A protein has these predicted regions:
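Extracellular/periplasmic carbohydrate-active domains that bind, remodel
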Residues: 1-184
């Protein structure tokens, strides 16, 4: 187990600036800012992160908890806890993220999926905070068993608030397409 503490008085700090390709993982890690300042807890905006795994990662404080950028190659996140970020818990720009068991606490925005190429799959997660929406989506999302509290809406998609603020059993951007008839 590893704890990375950026201390106090470091407004430009990044807890972990990380990139992995083909085989890499961050596991059992806590990243925290002593005074809540700093740019990001885990920053993966350098070209080109993934495939990689983040598992059992906690981030406390910072402007953003986890930042992901670039259109390649996809990341898997599981058992993620993001607390008290000033702007956003998880920011994704044009990458593909598969997330299971993510919890946010005290964030104004849980997930910002920006860029038309961004894809977020979010399963079995609890988004707690306070703000207009828990998830802001400008790309594509698939949500299953996602609950939220404290937000006005669970999802703002392409500028339109989607109904439902507490629990969403299943939702996806667009429509389901299948080549053959299938029993539902």
């Amino acid at each position: 187990d590893l704890v990375v503490d950026t201390g106090t008085g470091n407004p430009g700090a990044v807890g972990i600036d990380w990139i992995a390709n083909n085989l890499g993982a961050l596991r059992r890690i806590t990243v925290r800012s002593g005074d809540g300042q700093g740019v990001a807890g885990v920053d993966m905006t350098r070209a080109w992160p993934g495939p990689a795994l983040l598992r059992d990662v906690q981030v406390e404080g910072f402007e953003a908890g986890i930042r992901v950028g670039n259109a390649e190659y996809g990341l898997t996140l599981e058992d993620i806890t993001l607390r008290n970020q000033r702007t956003v818990g998880l920011s994704n720009t044009d990458n593909v993220l598969a997330i299971r068991h993510m919890t946010t606490e005290g964030v104004p925005l849980a997930i910002d999926n920006s860029g038309s190429g961004g894809h977020v799959i979010l399963l079995d997660s609890q988004l707690n905070g306070s703000g207009a929406e828990a998830i802001r989506n400008e790309g594509h999302v698939f949500l299953r068993r996602v609950a939220s509290s404290g937000f006005d809406a669970l999802l703002l998609e392409h500028g339109t608030a989607r109904p439902g603020t507490a629990v969403l059993d299943e939702y996806l951007t667009g429509t389901v397409q299948q080549p053959f008839d299938s029993p539902q």
